[in-house]
Amino acid sequence: MAAVFLVTLYEYSPLFYIAVVFTCFIVTTGLVLGWFGWDVPVILRNSEETQFSTRAFKKQMRQVKNPFGLEITNSSAASLATGMALRTDCLEDSRLTCYWGCSVQKLYEALQKHAYCFRISTPQALEEALYSDYLHREQYFIKKHSKEEIYCQLPSDTEIEDFGPVPRSRYPLVALLTLADEDDREIYDIISMVSVIHIPDKTYKLPCRILYQYLILAQGQFYDLKQLFMSANNSPPPSNDESPEDRSVEQSLLEKVGLAGNDGDPVEESSRDCVVCQNGGVNWVLLPCRHACLCDSCVRYFKQCPMCRQFVQESFALCGQKEPDKDLLETS
């Protein structure tokens, strides 16, 4: 019996040693990958580890004041045949110029010209860059802080029923907001705003909405204005201890980054609660998913967005007063 056992052990010992070596190799590889920031199974991670070794880059941001605001007030009823209603909210006297059937190619060529050739600070400058490649033009004078509705509609004599199948060579409507007073252009970094608007027609019935918004800077840059996403859970209304000045500053900041509601009402306190601890106020935006969902304390613990699980490449703070330790934002 002993001889049979020894023979069996001798036959299977190489397989046993191979299995042990292979297991050690897998565990060592997992630990090394985890040390250098690669995502590894939870079972291979240190149970006492409280923070990830890889930190998202902190994106350097510069605060600028956007003097322009534009929204669609009748998106459900708007169409190419009946027109649409726009509401502006500008900090200074401005001009709203609407270009119907603007060439897609010419528009982006015009934006590139702003960066390399000349500045798009007036409607005339944009029209020269477009080579007047649009079907109809309307212009309105906007008084500062006026929220009057402006109704835009193609004239009936144009006899345009649609802009063709997708992909299209023309945008239904391009709205340009510019500062009316030349002196105001020296005050603001943002000198104009281009909004590309889709309007449903007989061929393409997607609901009316703003497709893109580009902020045109005096220095020659232009940026695509993106919306941020926040949680909308129900919670008690905001406390009355907050001063009106603090509320106005907070609301102004949210409007600049696109978080304010379309109706201009203050954002509820629920939308400012951290989705993890439900305690601190939301102050960090994660990129590229654009979820604003973490407070100053919780941002250091995540390399994946807690809302959509997408890996975080960069992040930035909405307010600069409170920041985590610098070493927590460094990438190994």
UniProtKB/Swiss-Prot annotation:
SMART domains: RING
Keyword hit for Cytoplasm: no
GO biological process: regulation of cell cycle
GO molecular function: zinc ion binding
UniProt zinc finger (RING-type) residues: 274-309
Compartment(s): Nucleus; Endoplasmic reticulum
Domain of life assignment: Eukaryota
GO cellular component term, pick one: endoplasmic reticulum
Disulfide bonds: none
Chief place where the protein resides: nucleus
KW Nucleus (keyword) present: yes
Assigned keywords, A-Z: Cell cycle, Endoplasmic reticulum, Growth arrest, Metal-binding, Nucleus, Zinc, Zinc-finger
InterPro entries given in the database record: CGRF1, Znf_RING, Znf_RING/FYVE/PHD
Role played: Able to inhibit growth in several cell lines.
Name of this chain's protein: Cell growth regulator with RING finger domain protein 1
Organism of origin: Mus musculus (Mouse)
Gene coding for it: Cgrrf1
